[in-house]
Amino acid sequence: MQKNSPLHVLVIPTWYPNGEDKLIGVYHKLFCTALAEYGVKTNMLYVDRQGLSALPKYPTMQKVYEESNTGYVTYCRRMLDISKFSADAQLSAYCRTIEKLYKAYVKQHGKPDILHAHVTVPAGYAAAKLGEKYHIPVVITEHSSYFERFFEGSTAKYGLYAARHSVMTCVSGYMTDILKEKHNIPAEVLPNIGNTKAFRGAKKPKDPAHFRLTTVSALRPGKCVEDALQALKLLREQYPEKSFLYTIVGDGQEEALYKKTASALGLNDIVSFVGRKTESEIAEILSQTDALLMASDIETFGIPAVEALAAGVPVISTRCKGPESFLNDDCAELCNVHDPKDMEDAILRMAARSDTLDEAKIRAA
């Protein structure tokens, strides 16, 4: 790096929100924007893996493309995902594709000072191979809920190589503990980045007639919104004198199932599916919310919980690992995973004490 020149970081994510799921890996975009705003020269390389179902269209697909974002550019290259036939061959092809992107990138932007990969396999492994070959320091940040698989069985050789040729970080402390205790891999905590400033507006007055719950989530397996709906059904049956409203923000592959479940449980009059919303729209919804409800079976971090706290909104969450590191009695109620009755009890506890919570402590959590 030349004297007085900005730090140059090249980000390599495993996931990127350019397919049907516009939320998967969205934190990578927030991360790059934050680096750029801090004065770091930042860009991104992404391998867009196409499933074999895309094979008929693949020959005519544009193989190389780019996407301009706030403060950085994402350089993309498509490849076929052949992991169903051979995971080893797929990873080798992935590494070659990343190197092609890297060589083209260096011609345009010069050699980066740091490679920052997100998720150990495949992006972390590919970055570690690049770093060793081209003498570039590598940082890996692990986000995946199934990260232990990268250090076990046939994948272990790739995960261990990546960890030994990088500075290893994870978004939550429980992940670093597992890496250290089970796999003898030193790692530090590097939390996800969120734009909390967007959520620090004033809260709207409470609605004395209703306790308003909100879930902000991609509607995909593992988010377990069906458990939240079951908890709402229990509340309605056991406490008919209490009124709850539940807003679900987001979309995804489980949306139709969740809507069908809400209807079957007779909850259509109190449950609203409002679809995907912008950051400012989510902030407005949270300003009119009494508690955020998270029902996931596992979250490595939990950005919606951080956004809710920034908005002064307490959180009701399952004990889903990541959020437990920053939720406490001043701002949250916890319940067991896949336990609608325990979630019902947590909602009742929060409803009973929400008026006594210190908004300043919630925002500072």
Segments predicted by a language model, with ranges:
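Aromatic "clamp/platform" in nucleotide-sugar-dependent glycosyltransferases that forms part
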Residues: 297
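Conserved acidic donor-binding segment of nucleotide-sugar-dependent glycosyltransferases
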Residues: 329, 333-340, 349-355
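Carbohydrate-associated surface elements
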Residues: 174, 193
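Short alpha-helical donor nucleotide-sugar binding micro-motif in glycosyltransferases
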Residues: 276-277, 284-289
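Nucleotide-activated donor-binding/catalytic signature segment of Leloir-type glycosyltransferases, i.e.
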Residues: 259-277
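Conserved donor-binding/catalytic core segment of Leloir-type glycosyltransferases
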Residues: 10, 169, 205-234, 247
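N-terminal subdomain of nucleotide-sugar transferases
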Residues: 1-66
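Short hydrophobic beta-strand element within catalytic cores of glycosyltransferases
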Residues: 314-317
